[in-house]
């Protein structure tokens, strides 16, 4: 196992970024979520689906995906943990994150699932962190 050469302040910056990004997603603020990606960022979150490309494409994909919850008072929470960062030659970061999605309905018991691994390429800019690409793999789909 290699030791990461990512500075602690950068690691903390990425954790804060993920917290804000997931809170935007869970609150249904899809434009805010999409703005955490580069202009040409890619987002692939469902097995077998084509990636959404660009911020407008990401918003459209999230709106399409969440239509299934239109008449359902469900609250979904994305829990990111075990963030592993590795510097890439171009100055960006490879990020591998374990993710659990917790779903709860009023008066119900929280349910955990799916269990996923998030593979990101992150850019650190003067303005902060942006996601260049995201591929989400689902553990239940593993061979």
PLM regions and their residue ranges:
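A solvent-exposed, acidic/Ser-Thr-rich amphipathic alpha-helical stretch
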Residues: 32-88, 93-98
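A structural signal for alpha-helical segments
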Residues: 6-9, 50-53, 110
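Short, low-complexity N-terminal intrinsically disordered segments enriched in polar/charged residues
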Residues: 1-35
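Intrinsically disordered, low-complexity segments enriched in polar/charged residues with Gly/Pro
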Residues: 9-11, 28-30, 37, 70-73, ...
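Residues at helix-coil transition
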Residues: 26, 38-39, 124
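A beta-strand edge to alpha-helix "cap/lid" segment located at domain peripheries
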Residues: 2-4, 71-143
